[in-house]
Amino acid sequence: MSNRTLLAFDFGTKSIGVAIGQEITGTARALTSFKAQEGIPDWQKVEKLLSEWQPDLVVVGLPLNMDGTEQPLTARARKFANRLHGRFGVAIELHDERLSTVEARADLFERGGFKALDKGSVDAASAVIILESWFEAQH
């Protein structure tokens, strides 16, 4: 098992959550979230994250319907992943993110009630779930 550093993005049209993790431990933690305008992030913030954390791989959550089919947001998440690769040359993997937001909301509520459910916290927690799910799928 390698000790790669990974960043995960939970893509959304209004907000994007970010998590960081280490492949050797298979664990991730919430890093941040930032606003997006119609799915377009502040690319300077993205560049700062990539520069600061120097990930070996970036995992982008792929929103799918429960039956596994694509939805309108799926194409936008793919486009975001392609732009990440094109702008910064980072290796990208897409990973099924079905139910990550539901799970994140439940986890946050359990720990802090309604006050823990702000949008940024939910998005960053969703990115953690996406990355931990990716780790599990590798084994």
Swiss-Prot record:
It is found in: Cytoplasm. GO terms for molecular function: nuclease activity. Its main location: cytoplasm. CDD domains: YqgF. Gene3D superfamilies: YqgF/RNase H-like domain. Keywords: Cytoplasm, Hydrolase, Nuclease, Ribosome biogenesis. Signal peptide: none annotated. The keyword Cytoplasm applies. It holds the Pfam family RuvX. InterPro entries: RNaseH-like_sf, YqgF, YqgF/RNaseH-like_dom, YqgF/RNaseH-like_dom_sf. It is an enzyme of class 3 (hydrolase). One of its GO terms (biological process) is rRNA 5'-end processing. GO terms for cellular component: cytosol. Its EC number is 3.1.-.-. Could be a nuclease involved in processing of the 5'-end of pre-16S rRNA. This is Putative pre-16S rRNA nuclease. It comes from Pectobacterium atrosepticum (strain SCRI 1043 / ATCC BAA-672). The gene is yqgF.
